[in-house]
């Protein structure tokens, strides 16, 4: 299907994973705007992850310092994702076409980013997925931080989570259809 328009937006200069883009795709007489997003990660270091997985209190000062470092990264991530979610939502609202939003939200389903971006849209996992839907292979066995949201005018036909470790995220796919005219 031909792409008739494209746009890439970076939120923060020199920030490798803080970006989104969209393309307008023509299918027969319909045009769909597809967003691909990668919201701010927590940017945990190996030391952070090691401490999260197995907190130690042998040295109280070191433990306190590591805990404060982790909390600061959570705060920074939440605040940046709030700004990003608001910007993406504004672009969704401006779209003259039905929208699909897919990507790495780096946030869970009860988060501000999830609800802001997914407002008045259907989540493909919720519609057709099953189980916990874990998409992140690290830290926790239950983190679903990757999403596919579709316009309510579209039907989600199926959702698939691929349990292959190709990166630190498991791939997700959905088949969607425009309603018959």
Would you name each region that the model predicts?
Residues 15-17, 76-87:
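Soluble or luminal CAZymes and related metallo-dependent hydrolases
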Residues 8, 70-78:
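Surface-exposed cleft-lining segments at the edges of enzyme active sites
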Residues 1-49, 148, 160-163:
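Structured beta-strand-rich core segments of catalytic domains in phosphoester-bond hydrolases
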Residues 35-39, 61-67, 98-101, 125:
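Short charge-dense sequence patches
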Residues 82-100, 105-181:
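Metal-dependent phosphoester-hydrolase catalytic domains
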Residues 49-73:
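A solvent-exposed, charged loop/short amphipathic helix patch at secondary-structure junctions
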Residues 44-55, 75-79, 108-113:
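Phosphate-binding glycine-rich loops and adjacent basic patches that engage nucleotide phosphates
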